[in-house]
């Protein structure tokens, strides 16, 4: 996967955040049990640096285009420092640190691996658009005309596509790949292209 991802390029940079698969919990432990979440993260940071990516770990960066600018923020995973009841030792989502130097007037895009953070992100009042993934619609979408059902509805109040509250938006990408069972039913791999236009 890293070889394919390394071809991604952008004139304004490629930005990333940590997700649950980056912590190494789904890999078989080495015989000496040294492949810890911290070791997995160090390895991933090195790989991303070699690819020219910028990891946003409770940090924000301004992108300027002429007289205009937007701020891209990225928050850490997991939200509370625990994954499935296990402490990662890598901290968690810290919105105060993330938005420390972000002006209220700036247009902000926040990247949060999990959409479960959105209520806190929205209440912080900085993010105009939040981009998330994680859910994969639980790898199952049943389509009935224009209606779609997924078991993700039982666990997540927001699980796929576009949501809005006032002037704040959340988009959840269905991603690609799988966990546990090697299939995706009606949940097609997704790459999302979002065009930003200035208000008229």
Which ranges hold each PLM region?
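Short, conserved loop/helix-junction motifs that constitute active-site signature segments
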Residues: 5-11, 102-104, 123-125
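Acidic/histidine-rich helix-loop elements
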Residues: 24-39, 80-90, 144-155, 179-186
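Core catalytic region of metal-dependent phosphoesterases/phosphodiesterases
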Residues: 1-64
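Beta-strand-turn-beta hairpins that frame and shape the catalytic cleft
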Residues: 53-54, 60-74, 103-104, 164-169, ...
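Active-site metal-binding loops of divalent metal-dependent hydrolases
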Residues: 20-22, 59-60, 75-78, 114, ...
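Short beta-strand-to-coil "C-cap" segments at the C-terminal boundary of structured domains/repeats
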Residues: 194-200
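Catalytic-adjacent loop/helix segments of enzymes that bind and process anionic phosphate/sulfate esters
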Residues: 65, 70-112
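Conserved beta-sheet core of the metallophosphoesterase superfamily
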Residues: 15-16, 109, 115-192
């Amino acid at each position: 996967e890293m070889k394919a991802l390394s071809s991604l390029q952008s004139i304004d940079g490629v930005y990333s955040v940590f997700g649950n698969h980056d912590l190494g919990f789904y890999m078989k432990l080495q015989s000496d049990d040294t492949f810890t979440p911290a070791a997995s993260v160090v390895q991933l940071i090195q790989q991303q640096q070699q690819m020219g990516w910028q990891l946003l770990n409770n940090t924000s960066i301004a992108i300027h285009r002429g007289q205009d600018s937007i701020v891209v923020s990225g928050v850490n995973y997991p939200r509370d420092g625990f994954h499935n009841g296990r402490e990662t030792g890598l901290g968690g989502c810290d919105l105060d640190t993330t938005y420390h130097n972000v002006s209220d007037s700036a247009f902000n895009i926040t990247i949060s691996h999990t959409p479960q953070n959105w209520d806190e992100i929205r209440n912080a009042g900085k993010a105009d658009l939040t981009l998330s993934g994680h859910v994969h619609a639980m790898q199952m979408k049943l389509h009935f005309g224009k209606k779609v059902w997924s078991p993700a509805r039982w666990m997540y109040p927001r699980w796929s596509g576009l949501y809005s509250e006032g002037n704040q938006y959340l988009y959840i990408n269905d991603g690609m790949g799988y966990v546990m069972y090697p299939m995706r039913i009606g949940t097609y791999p997704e790459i999302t292209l979002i065009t930003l236009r200035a208000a008229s």
